[in-house]
Each structure stands twice: as C-alpha cells, then as structure tokens.
Amino acid sequence: MAGTGNDNPGNFANRPKEEVQAIASKGGQASHSGGFASMDPEKQREIASKGGKASSGSFEPGSEKAREAGRKGGKASGGTGADDDE
C-alpha cells in the first residue's frame, strides 16, 4: 500500500494503481441500475405529479418542532451567525 499513513481501503491512495485505473475507466457510470431515471416515463410522471406529497414528512409546516429544527440546521451550516438571536 501507499505510504499515506491512512489504511482506509476506501481511500484511492491506498489501492493498487491498476485497480484505481479500472474504477476510473468506468467514469460516471452508475454502479447499479434502477432509480427514477430508469423508470417508465408514465411512472415518472405519476410520481412527479405528487410533488412531494408522497413524503411522510417529519414536521407539520409552521410547527414549533419545525422552527426548532430550522434553527439547529442554520447553526450547523457554518454560517456567520450574524443573524443569530443567541
């Protein structure tokens, strides 16, 4: 293995050059088939027409829990904090 000091096998620097080249030669090809893009166009339209309504959702819009989650998310985003109340 390469001398990176990191033995994580997911790190390309730790893999043999030939293996990395084989992976790279696949480019952006998906590692699996399926998902929205491979669906029948009619099925795609059916799902898309629901516009997120099929999502179970975590919060009732405007609820205190939703506001709290939004505050926490904003703090975790690494913003400047200029608009923070605290």
Curated annotation (Swiss-Prot):
Keywords of the record: Conidiation, Differentiation, Sporulation
Superkingdom of origin organism: Eukaryota
Renumbered residue ranges of the record's region Disordered: 1-86
Designated name of the protein: Conidiation-specific protein 10
Compositional bias per record (Gly residues), positions renumbered to this chain: 75-86
Gene that encodes it: con-10
Biased composition (Low complexity): 49-58
Residue spans of biased composition, Basic and acidic residues class: 62-71
Biological process, per Gene Ontology: conidium formation; sporulation resulting in formation of a cellular spore
Protein family according to the UniProt entry: Belongs to the con-10 family.
Regions of compositional bias (Polar residues) in chain numbering: 1-11
Ubl conjugation listed as a keyword: no
UniProt entry tagged with the keyword Aminoacyl-tRNA synthetase: no
